[in-house]
UniProtKB/Swiss-Prot annotation:
Together with DpaA, catalyzes the conversion of dihydrodipicolinate to dipicolinate (DPA), which constitutes up to 10% of the dry weight of the spore. Induction: Is not expressed during vegetative growth; is expressed at stage 5 of sporulation specifically in the mother cell compartment, under the control of the sigma-K factor. Is repressed by GerE. This is Dipicolinate synthase subunit B. One of its GO terms (molecular function) is oxidoreductase activity. Coiled coil: none annotated.
Length: 200
């Protein structure tokens, strides 16, 4: 995937802690392909401890993987627009809460500011959703983002249609291919994919 070599990619983490195990191998792959990956984290990522791990541990892990200090404030994220422009901004996982804010032009976290700065530069933003209400109240926000210029999605599908019928999660292993397409301002297809791992 040599097309990613030398590309400056912002990588935003939001608070879907249960999805990190699927995301971090993709960060490592981007680094191995020669991309310059700049980590960006929301306030919740840094401060929240869950059964999936402590916030500080996840931040240290992404810093160790990328070799860069995590951007953890809106002030630090703002220069990604004019002074340190990204070739592409990734938000994965993207929670329903952050998706709602992004769709409605709110910039109250470092990750959302980094996305706004990238869109301002007419560069692609890649989203990897992980939300329990993608087919519920957040459906309108999902559709709004899908029809927004310079926003692209890691293909996604229902992860548990019987127990959580409104839930949708991106297939994170498709992230590198999605970025390659997004850099050409194209959406990786198909965008709706089978993502159910159960036996029902």
């Amino acid at each position: 995937m040599s097309s990613l070599k030398g590309k400056r990619i912002g990588f935003g983490l939001t608070g879907s802690h249960c999805t990190y195990e699927a995301v971090f191998p993709q960060i490592e792959e981007l680094v191995n392909e020669g991309a310059e990956v700049r980590p960006v984290v929301t306030f919740n990522v840094k401060s929240t401890n869950t059964r999936f791990g402590e916030g500080a541990e996840w931040v240290k892990k992404i810093e160790d993987l990328t070799g860069y200090e995590a951007i953890d404030s809106i002030v630090k994220a703002e220069p990604l627009g004019p002074k340190l422009p990204l070739d592409c901004m990734v938000i994965a996982p993207l929670t329903g809460n952050s998706m709602s804010k992004l769709a409605n032009a709110m910039t109250d976290s470092p990750v959302l500011m980094a996305a706004k700065a990238t869109i301002r530069n007419n560069r692609p933003v890649v989203l990897g959703i992980s939300t329990n209400d993608a087919l519920g109240l957040n459906g309108t926000n999902l559709m709004r983002l899908m029809s927004t210029k310079n926003i692209f999605f890691i293909p996604f599908g229902q992860d548990d249609p019987f127990k959580k019928p409104n839930s949708m999660v991106a297939k994170m292993d498709l992230l590198p291919q999605t970025i390659e397409k997004a850099l050409m301002h194209q959406q990786l297809q198909p965008i709706l994919v089978e993502n159910y791992q159960g036996n029902d």
